[in-house]
Curated annotation (Swiss-Prot):
GO MF assignments: ATP binding; carbohydrate kinase activity; phosphotransferase activity, alcohol group as acceptor; protein kinase activity
Signal peptide limits: none
UniProt catalytic activity: 3-O-[beta-D-GalNAc-(1->3)-beta-D-GlcNAc-(1->4)-alpha-D-Man]-L-Thr-[protein] + ATP = 3-O-[beta-D-GalNAc-(1->3)-beta-D-GlcNAc-(1->4)-(O-6-P-alpha-D-Man)]-Thr-[protein] + ADP + H(+)
Gene name in the database record: Pomk
Record's keyword annotation contains Flavoprotein: no
Protein name: Protein O-mannose kinase
Organism annotation: Rattus norvegicus
Membrane topology: Single-pass type II membrane protein
Any matching Pfam family: PK_Tyr_Ser-Thr
Purpose: Protein O-mannose kinase that specifically mediates phosphorylation at the 6-position of an O-mannose of the trisaccharide (N-acetylgalactosamine (GalNAc)-beta-1,3-N-acetylglucosamine (GlcNAc)-beta-1,4-mannose) to generate phosphorylated O-mannosyl trisaccharide (N-acetylgalactosamine-beta-1,3-N-acetylglucosamine-beta-1,4-(phosphate-6-)mannose). Phosphorylated O-mannosyl trisaccharide is a carbohydrate structure present in alpha-dystroglycan (DAG1), which is required for binding laminin G-like domain-containing extracellular proteins with high affinity.
InterPro entries listed in its UniProt record: Kinase-like_dom_sf, POMK, Prot_kinase_dom, Ser-Thr/Tyr_kinase_cat_dom
GO biological process: one example: neuromuscular process
GO CC annotations on file: endoplasmic reticulum membrane
Length: 349
C-alpha cells in the first residue's frame, strides 16, 4: 500500500511538468501566431523618416554601413562598369551597371533635345530624396548620366508576373497588395506636399505608362523612379499645368484633361485649359485596382474602398478628395481589416 501511495505521488509530480509544458507550448504557439499576424499586417504608410537615411548629398544602399557622397563625374566615368541595357525611354537609356560590388542603374541621356527634361528629372531626384523616391548615387550633368540604386524586380508593371512566381507566393495576398496600394497613394501625397511644392505626375496618360514610373523593391515596397515630368501647381499664384501638347483620349485620364470643345473643333494646344493635381486623384482607383489584383480577398478590399474611389472619380476636380484624404481612408480600411482578421484569429485559439 505504501509503495502504491508513493507511486501515485511520484506519478503526480512527473505529470505536473508535462501539463505545464503543454500550457507553455500553447502559449508559445499563440505568441508566434500573433507575431506572424503582425508581420503579415505591417502597418502601411512610411510617414516617419527612416533613421538610416543619409543627409542631403549622400547615399546608402544595399549592405552599405555608412553614407557615401554622391559620385562625381570623374567617379562615374572610372568606377562604374556598364553591364547591359535594361530599359529605354524617350529621354534616356538605362543600363544595369556595377559600382563597388553593388548593382546600380546608370541612366544616359539619349537625345540632346531632351536635355531639359533630363535636367528636370535630375533636379527632382536630388531635391525629393526620401523613402518615396529611388536612391540617387551620383550624377554628371556634363555627360548626361544619373546613377541610382538598382531594383531587380523592375517596373511596377511587372507586379503580376513577379507575384505569380512560386517563390513569391507567400506575398501574393490581399494584405500585401493593399499595402502596396497604400504606398502608392503615399507617394502621390508626398508629391502633392513635396519640398518643391505641389508636383503632378504627368507621365500618366494610361495605366502602363503610369506603372512604369515606379519600381518594385526587393522587400515589396514602391518607389517613384521616373521624375522627368513633374510640373508645379501653385494655387496661390494660379499656376496650373498641362501634361504634354497633344490631345489626350480615353477614360484613364481625368475629364479635365480631355479636349472640351467637341469633335467639330480641331485640337489646339493653346486653347486647351490647364488643370491641377486633382488629375492624379482621378487615376488612383484604376492604379489601386491593378495593385489589388484578383487574389482571394481583393474584392472585399475593393468593397471597403468603394466610397473613397467614388469620390476620386467625381467629374468636378474641386470636389475630389485630396491625396491626404485618400491616404487616410486607405489606412483606415487597412487597420479595420487587420483588426477584424486578428480578432477572428484570436477567437479561434
Amino acid at each position: 500500500m505504501g509503495q502504491q501511495h508513493g507511486a501515485r505521488n511520484g506519478l503526480t509530480h512527473r505529470e505536473l511538468p508535462r501539463g505545464m509544458g503543454l500550457l507553455l507550448a500553447m502559449a508559445l504557439m499563440n505568441v508566434v501566431l500573433y507575431v506572424c499576424l503582425d508581420h503579415l499586417f505591417i502597418s502601411p504608410g512610411r510617414a516617419t523618416e527612416d533613421p538610416r537615411r543619409c543627409p542631403p548629398g549622400y547615399f546608402r544602399m544595399g549592405r552599405m554601413r555608412n553614407c557615401s557622397r554622391w559620385l562625381s563625374c570623374e567617379e562615374l566615368r572610372t568606377e562604374v562598369r556598364q553591364l547591359k541595357l535594361v530599359g529605354e525611354g524617350a529621354v534616356k537609356r538605362v543600363f544595369l551597371s556595377e559600382w563597388n560590388e553593388h548593382k546600380v542603374a546608370l541612366s544616359r541621356l539619349t537625345r540632346l533635345e531632351m536635355k531639359e527634361d533630363f535636367l528636370h528629372g535630375l533636379r527632382m531626384l536630388t531635391s525629393l530624396q526620401s523613402q518615396h523616391v529611388v536612391t540617387l548615387a551620383g550624377f554628371c550633368e556634363e555627360d548626361g548620366t544619373i546613377l541610382t540604386e538598382y531594383h531587380p524586380l523592375g517596373s511596377l508593371s511587372n507586379l503580376e508576373e513577379t507575384l505569380n512566381l512560386s517563390k513569391y507566393r507567400d506575398v501574393n495576398t490581399w494584405q500585401h497588395r493593399l499595402r502596396l496600394a497604400v504606398e502608392y497613394v503615399s507617394i502621390i501625397n508626398y508629391l502633392h506636399h513635396s519640398p518643391l511644392g505641389t508636383r503632378v505626375m504627368c507621365d500618366s496618360n494610361d495605366l502602363p505608362k503610369t506603372l512604369s514610373q515606379y519600381l518594385l523593391t526587393s522587400n515589396f515596397s514602391i518607389v517613384a523612379n521616373d521624375l522627368d515630368a513633374l510640373p508645379l501647381v501653385d494655387h496661390g499664384s494660379r499656376v496650373l499645368v498641362k501634361c504634354g501638347h497633344r490631345e489626350l483620349h480615353g477614360d484613364f485620364v481625368a475629364p479635365e484633361q480631355l479636349w472640351p470643345y467637341g469633335e467639330d473643333t480641331p485640337f489646339q494646344d493653346d486653347l486647351m485649359p490647364p488643370y491641377d493635381e486633382k488629375i492624379d486623384i482621378w487615376k488612383i482607383p484604376d492604379v489601386s485596382s491593378f495593385l489589388l489584383g484578383h487574389v482571394e480577398g481583393s474584392d472585399m478590399v475593393r468593397f471597403h474602398l468603394f466610397d473613397i474611389h467614388k469620390a476620386c472619380k467625381n467629374q468636378f476636380p474641386a470636389e475630389r478628395p485630396t491625396a491626404q484624404n485618400v491616404l487616410d481612408a486607405y489606412q483606415k480600411v487597412f487597420h479595420s481589416l487587420r483588426d477584424t482578421v486578428m480578432s477572428q484569429t484570436k477567437e479561434m485559439l
